Amino acid sequence: MRLTRIKAGNFRNFQHLDVQPAAGLNIVRGRNAQGKTNFIEAVFFALRGHSFRSLRDRELVTWGQESAFVEAELEGKDGRTRVRAELNPAGKKIVWAGEPVGKAELAVRLGTVLFTPDDLSLIKGGPRERRRFLDLELGIFVPGYLTALQLYRRALEQRNHLLRMGGGRRYSELLDLWTDEVCKYGMMLLSGRLEILKEFAPLACRLFGAWAGEELAVRYRSSVGLSNGVRTPGAGDLRETLAAVRQDEIRAGQTQAGPHLDDLAFMVNGKEGRPFASQGQQRSVVLALKLAQVFLWKRHTGEAPVVLLDDLLFEFDRERRDKVLETLQNDVQVFITTGERVLSGSRVFCVHSGNIQEES
């Protein structure tokens, strides 16, 4: 899949945006605070239906304006299509191929891989960041995963509410009911995570080794005591764990085992990346994770996603940067933001004060 045209009106500092990018490498250059990241955000918003920088859609609308839109024209193996996202005081409306859709459907249908400085939180941050990556970036490749995730969160909320109430026969019956639901959907999530990691982890480790000449290992840390797909987990595994900690849960008012507490560990040369890896190693690990997603998209859909790299590629040395670009050369459309530097073989767009023009 590739983006053939991106248009926007009153989006951030772009009052009017109309760009026809190259099918391959696109460089978006300009000084700081001119709109480079806003351009990447516009593309991402069109393809995903939400921002990667702001939780409030209203912040995306140009100051003093009431509404905004972003529209993307796309070309893929099934032909041409269009997606349009509109923001106004009444809310957000997304239309894809003439039909209203939600952002969850866009995430599954329109391949997008984003790498920004904030993604270093996959290594530096807490377990929640890594679970979010598992659920929203990798879970889309497992049939039924996102539905199971919604049902698990609902069951978990109900169970936690009961744990905080305490007491009575009716309470005990309801707690057992929601415990069954938590176990059922929780083990669906765990099975799905282990399944996709068996495919994803070798890709990321191979990419990291090719660029860095070092060893990367990915470890799944489960609160149920299962890891790395040793065997297929079942609902009974989680049920036994929850039974063992029931009194602790009642005192705490929280479910104390399940995929909502699990974590990933990234081991660089046998040592955990979060406390021991250098800044450069951490950056290389995250880039390997992101580009492994590109291969997953191609493997599962037969099409490459649109790749968005916000400023970070130029923080690598030239040899490693060339290896990354070589990896992406085959049928992958890439957008890279930078201050001034330009790569040969690319289409270059210059951003200045919310205006963007192609350089000849």
UniProtKB/Swiss-Prot annotation:
Domain of life of the native organism: Bacteria
MF term (GO), any: single-stranded DNA binding
GO biological process, one term: double-strand break repair
A GO-annotated cellular component: cytoplasm
Keyword DNA repair: yes
InterPro entries per UniProt: DNA-binding_RecF, DNA-binding_RecF_CS, P-loop_NTPase, RecF/RecN/SMC_N, RecF_2
Location(s), subcellular: Cytoplasm
Alphabetic keyword roster: ATP-binding, Cytoplasm, DNA damage, DNA repair, DNA replication, DNA-binding, Nucleotide-binding, SOS response
HAMAP family, per the entry: RecF
Function: The RecF protein is involved in DNA metabolism; it is required for DNA replication and normal SOS inducibility. RecF binds preferentially to single-stranded, linear DNA. It also seems to bind ATP.
NCBIfam families membership: recf
UniProt record similarity statement: Belongs to the RecF family.
Protein name, per record: DNA replication and repair protein RecF
Protein source organism: Desulforudis audaxviator (strain MP104C)
The encoding gene: recF
